[in-house]
UniProtKB/Swiss-Prot annotation:
Pfam families, alphabetized: tRNA-synt_1f
Name of encoding gene: lysS
PANTHER family membership: LYSINE--TRNA LIGASE
The UniProt record lists the keyword Secreted: no
Taxonomic lineage of the native organism: Archaea, Methanobacteriati, Methanobacteriota, Methanomada group, Methanopyri
Organism of origin: Methanopyrus kandleri (strain AV19 / DSM 6324 / JCM 9639 / NBRC 100938)
Keyword entries, A-Z: Aminoacyl-tRNA synthetase, ATP-binding, Cytoplasm, Ligase, Nucleotide-binding, Protein biosynthesis
Protein name: Lysine--tRNA ligase
Subcellular location: Cytoplasm
GO CC terms, sorted: cytoplasm
Superkingdom of the source species: Archaea
Main enzyme class: ligase
Length: 555
């Protein structure tokens, strides 16, 4: 029996959750996601949204057509460190200031990152409603909930305090005012609360990121309903602390499900505290959780502040968008995912291609079918694309000389190689033709930006002499005879075996044989898989280079 895909399990849980707390399903089911706009938003941030999108897709298909997916940008949080992208262009004076009040050009720092990210998400098939947390704090309904929270806590009501004390959070910053004098939110504390009025002071020393900030000493009053101006931008007068703000959002938006990083799911973490506040203080059921593991890049955590990340746009330039969705959604959200944009990307495309072929051949089981359908950015095509391996396209792109966009002449030369090597079962038309062109362009960019040195090459125009031992010469002579044999097929696997057989006949170690071969053909000790290279370049040209080298090396 095939196991269900995790998205189907979660969609059913969400439906049962909604029915448990009401007689019938709500008019709309809300699935939330979000991120702090502390810097350039990347693929790691996208796992949150793609997970939400997967649950929403299954909900719409099976249970409820009206599903709302919201993405909240945490833009009232304080700047903790200067991102490497803006190092030298953003003053450290902005440390501790809300993202929404930091100017980058003519717009707030946070809007720049959030807008780009939402546009990228749409390109990857995730339609979300972008909600700025700053805008939430100007909404009358949300502000009323904020008033209820701060008046209970600072006014001695005791309901919220009793929950926080249970988790050892007696000294939590429940509300964080923005100082009207210095613009910082990281250096203030509440002195008194009376209805809508907040009295605060900006004082003390506060560690934030790698810096220590000192309050400016200003004492002032704020109205929870009225925005203030900081650096030319209207922003909320303050915000709730994260562990209190999160459940307040759930209540206001009616959230039924939310994915989030696994760090929030530990005992005493944000989700457990938030659930207690939602249920005990507001009387609202905590949403169905979908904790997920972080996506790493080359084994390290992605970080916009440290410049170690890859964006959705970066990925889309060098690989199909569906492949990233496939990588994120095929396994359970808590499964570790490390991105390797070198050879790991090639394997990822191979795996996706294999799934796609199984899907169209009717060989995929129900779980595999769900994975493929969730991986799609657009509608499922009517026919299976012509699956010329991405790694072969990367070799062909270099043989043909493609750089970024593919000209019609380059495309026809590439098609001729695909035909000669048996990679095309039928002549591509329409969708298939454009799909192949796109794959060639992406493969070319991958070579330029991420391919390891051994995957990059330039085939010699003319033969050149190479210093050869007797065994190496014997190997090359036997190899060229085999290649010129009428029985030789120009498919990569057959050609790879041919190289191994010639090496074995000459009594040469495979590593030494390949080193000699690459020196003859591309002038380096290493290169792409030999069989693939021979197939792409063509047996005739390879044979000419080998024979020419043998002759030149005799002199």
């Amino acid at each position: 029996m095939t196991k269900e895909h995790w998205s189907e399990v979660k969609a059913r849980e969400v439906t049962e959750h909604c029915r448990k707390h009401a007689d019938e399903l709500p008019d709309e089911i809300v699935v939330a996601s979000g991120a702090s706009t502390s810097g350039r938003l990347h693929v790691g941030n996208a796992r949150d949204v793609l997970t939400a999108d997967a649950v929403a897709r299954v909900l719409r298909e099976r249970y409820h057509e009206d599903v709302r997916v919201v993405w909240i940008s945490d833009d009232v949080d304080p700047l903790r460190r200067i991102p490497r992208d803006l190092d030298g262009r953003l003053s450290e004076d902005y440390l501790g200031v809300p993202y929404k009040a930091i100017p980058v050009g003519d717009e707030p720092y946070s809007d720049r990152w959030a807008r780009n990210f939402v546009e990228e998400l749409r390109e990857f098939g995730a339609e979300v409603e972008w909600i700025s947390s700053a805008e939430l704090y100007t909404d009358n309904g949300f502000v009323k909930l904020v008033r209820e929270v701060v008046n209970d806590y600072y006014g001695g009501g005791g309901r919220l305090a009793s929950v926080l004390e249970r988790f050892g959070l007696e000294d939590a910053r429940v509300y964080m005012p923005v100082c009207e004098e210095c613009g910082r939110i990281a250096t203030t504390r509440v002195v008194d609360v009376d209805g809508w009025r907040i009295e605060y002071v900006c004082e003390g020393r506060h560690e934030i990121g790698d810096a220590v900030l000192e309050g400016c000493g200003h004492r002032g009053e704020l109205d929870l309903r009225k925005p203030i101006e900081v650096n030319g931008f209207e922003i909320p007068p303050g915000k709730l602390g994260w562990k209190i703000e999160w459940p307040t959002r759930w209540v206001y938006l009616g959230v039924a499900c939310e994915p989030f990083g696994k760090d929030h799911y530990v005992a005493g973490g944000s989700y457990e505290v938030g659930s207690a506040i939602a249920e005990e203080f507001f009387g609202f059921p905590a949403p169905v959780p979908v904790p997920y593991e972080w996506i790493t890049l080359d084994g390290k955590a992605m970080s916009s502040s440290k410049g170690h990340y890859v964006t959705l746009s970066d990925w889309g330039e060098v690989c199909h968008r569906e492949v990233l969705r496939y990588l994120v959604l095929r396994g359970k959200p808590l499964k570790h995912l490390d991105l390797d944009l070198r050879f790991g990307l090639l394997q990822a495309v191979d795996d996706y291609d294999e799934l796609e072929k199984r899907y169209f051949a009717g060989e995929a089981d129900e779980r595999e079918r769900r994975i493929y359908e969730l991986s799609r950015v657009d509608e499922i095509p009517e026919e299976c694309p012509p699956h010329v391996p991405f790694r072969f396209c990367a070799v062909v792109a270099q043989v043909v000389g493609i750089e970024d966009d593919v000209s019609e002449e380059e495309f026809e030369r590439a098609l001729e190689i695909f035909r000669r090597t048996g990679h095309l079962e039928a002549e591509p038309e329409g969708f298939g033709r454009e799909w192949l062109r796109e794959r060639l362009e992406k493969a070319s960019r991958w070579v330029d930006r991420y391919a390891p040195e051994e995957a990059r090459f330039r085939v010699r125009e003319e033969p050149e002499p190479v210093e050869l031992s007797d065994k190496e010469r014997e190997f090359l002579e036997d190899l060229v005879r085999r290649l010129e044999s009428e029985t030789t097929k120009e498919d990569p696997e057959t050609l790879q075996r041919t190289v191994f057989e010639a090496a074995r006949t000459a009594g040469l170690r495979p590593a030494d044989a390949f080193r000699v071969f690459y020196n003859v053909v591309v002038g380096k000790d290493r290169g792409p898989r030999a069989g693939t290279l021979i197939a792409a370049v063509g047996v005739d040209r390879i044979s000419r280079l080998i024979r020419g080298c043998l002759e030149a090396s005799e002199d």
